[in-house]
Amino acid sequence: IGFIGTGKITTSVITGLFRSKANLKQILISERSKKNSRALAKRLKQVKVVKDNQEIINRSNWVVLAVVPTVAKKILQDLKFKKGQTVISFVSTLNMKDLRRFASPATLVFKAAPLPMVESKLGPIVLYPSNNKVNALFNKIGTVINAKNEKENNYLWTLTAGMATYLELCATLENWLVQRKVNTAKAKRLVTSLVFGLSHTLLLSKQDTRSLVREYQTKKGINEELLLRLKKDKVFDKINKNLNTIFARIKKANDQ
């Protein structure tokens, strides 16, 4: 398997694959970025840095495209793929039509959206279209969520924009305590335990999430009060509105 582009996501995916003990004899990675590629090659003996992107394609059965969106088309237009190769793109703004055109004559072409936590074998991985072998590989490092079509794929990718916002909420809760002289480590431990407990509840519960929202508040209790205050301030309406804006951006990029 070869990776063209060695940023944070590529580093996380490769780290997760080795932690999952995936049977990969060799992983070829591009030199860009030099810092990440050298660190991976130094840490993992199966990883080899290759200076030329075309050489990665020539030597790989599976090719992962993980370059930044702004240069993706420029890089891909000069590359030649092979019939029978599996080509997987991590590029959010590259639509399937263009991807298939660039990857031709390869016909096994996919879009995937792994997130940084895959290095710990956690988190969703949006994948389109579904394929047993590709699903099996990515299920080793996360939870594959297959989109039924490209429109749904765009919807699912939109939700991945919520990572930093979720962490900002956690940071806000922590900082509220720290500002009131609570020890920083203690504040983080409380918030981390709270988030873990809620995530575990969501994972195991057979109820829909809206039912859990009702269950986790009592009449005239503090959970009900904070939720009602945030609703009155239209916090959740604003999140919904801005998700629509993010979706429009992804859709526009994929329609080009």
Where are these regions (language model features)?
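Rossmann-like NAD(P)-binding element
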Residues: 35, 47-48, 53-86
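Internal alpha-helical scaffold of NAD(P)-dependent oxidoreductase catalytic cores
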Residues: 98-108, 122-204, 247-253
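Rossmann-fold dehydrogenase core element
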Residues: 85-89, 99-116
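NAD(P)-dependent Rossmann-like dehydrogenase/reductase catalytic/cofactor-binding core
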Residues: 192, 196-256
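Short, charged/polar "capping" segments at the starts of alpha-helices
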Residues: 34-40, 96-98, 132
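NAD(P)+-binding Rossmann beta1-loop-alpha1 motif at the extreme N-terminus of oxidoreductases
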Residues: 1-51, 55, 178-179
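Short, conserved loop/helix-junction motifs that constitute active-site signature segments
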Residues: 21-23, 78-84, 102-106
